[in-house]
């Protein structure tokens, strides 16, 4: 994610374009990746990039360190990487580079794919091709001691205005974005069905939960400036990640936040305590006068007088 051209947004952008190009997607998730990595295969992959014997020795010892169970029982580790280990994600990515990436290049020529950690997508021309690839994936991962997650691995039809095949699954989630058919407008203002990415339902639910956790209505000892300083860094982060594609998906988050700010006004000022409409109008006037105060207000998500 820190390499140029390899960020999550790069992966989303590439996936969007491929979904427009290919009608079918095979999405897969590896079940318990970190617990099931084969040590011998991992060390073989590592030796392709490192010849320093003492370093290889330390990595191998670190992989095999015993686990102390809750009851004090010592259990030998025969596979997997230590939970929470700082280099576990790096080693897992190296492992999958050879187990999946190189395998796909060799065995699936011409098939576009994208993998981010243990989540991956392969784009197909037809349903029979997608079914064959899903079967090949299942066999490949079993070959190296891994298993694709049965509940998170599917074939998806990328439905839009020009694709009207009836299929039971027409959406998937990747890197916090839901890819699904959405209503869009063209340059003439005409509505049409498009297959695109937007903040996932799970991500929106999590953002709303964060807003609820802030308990803004109970912070009536704070000024509105203090609230803005407290939450703006988080709002900026949400928008910079999820607002990159289909910004409209975030409108429910911003509306939810405005409702909490309105409740804050009602708790802070007695004259508005039982008058939600008046509290909303008061907040709307502040938004007009100080559009820069809250990050989402700058984006145009303000209350109306």
Regions found by a protein language model. Name each.
Residues 116, 153-161, 231-234, 252-258, ...:
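A glycine-rich phosphate-binding loop feature that marks nucleotide/adenosyl-phosphate handling sites
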Residues 105, 157-165, 296, 300-304:
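Flexible, glycine/threonine-enriched loop-and-boundary segments that flank and lead into catalytic domains
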Residues 8, 220, 224, 246-250:
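Residue-level recognition of alpha-helical structural elements
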Residues 227-272:
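Non-catalytic, peripheral interaction segments enriched in hydrophobic/basic residues
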Residues 24, 38-40, 72-75, 116, ...:
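Short acidic (Asp/Glu) and glycine-rich catalytic loops that position anionic groups and cofactors
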Residues 256, 260, 265, 269-305:
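Extended C-terminal regions of large enzymes
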Residues 1-159, 171:
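Conserved polymerase palm-domain catalytic core
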Residues 64, 144-219:
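A conserved non-catalytic segment of reverse transcriptases
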């Amino acid at each position: 994610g820190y390499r140029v051209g390899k960020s999550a947004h790069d992966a989303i952008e590439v996936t969007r374009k491929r979904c427009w190009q290919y009608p079918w997607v095979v999405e897969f998730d590896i079940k318990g990746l970190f617990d099931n990595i084969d040590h011998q295969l991992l060390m073989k992959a590592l030796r392709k990039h490192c010849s320093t014997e003492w370093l290889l020795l330390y990595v191998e010892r670190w992989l095999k360190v015993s686990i102390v169970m809750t009851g004090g029982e010592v259990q030998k580790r025969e596979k997997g990487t230590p939970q929470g280990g700082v280099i576990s994600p790096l080693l897992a990515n190296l492992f999958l580079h050879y187990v999946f990436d190189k395998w796909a290049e060799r065995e699936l020529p011409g098939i576009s794919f994208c993998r981010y950690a243990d989540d991956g997508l392969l784009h197909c021309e037809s349903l029979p091709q997608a079914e064959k690839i899903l079967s090949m994936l299942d066999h490949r991962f079993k070959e190296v001691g891994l298993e694709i997650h049965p509940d998170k691995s599917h074939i998806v039809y990328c439905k839009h205005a020009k694709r009207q095949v009836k299929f039971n699954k027409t959406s998937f989630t990747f890197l916090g974005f839901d890819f699904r058919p959405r209503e869009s407008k063209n340059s003439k203002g005409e509505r049409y069905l498009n297959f695109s990415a937007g903040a996932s339902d799970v991500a929106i639910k999590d953002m709303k939960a964060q807003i609820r956790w802030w308990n803004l209505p109970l912070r009536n000892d704070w000024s509105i400036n203090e609230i803005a300083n407290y939450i703006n860094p988080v709002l900026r982060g949400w928008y910079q990640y999820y607002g990159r594609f289909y910004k409209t998906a975030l409108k429910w988050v911003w509306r939810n936040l405005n409702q909490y700010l309105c409740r804050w006004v009602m708790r802070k000022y007695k004259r508005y305590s039982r008058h939600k409409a008046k509290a909303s109008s008061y907040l709307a006037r502040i938004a007009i006068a100080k559009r820069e105060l809250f990050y989402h207000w700058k984006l145009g998500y303000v209350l109306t007088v």
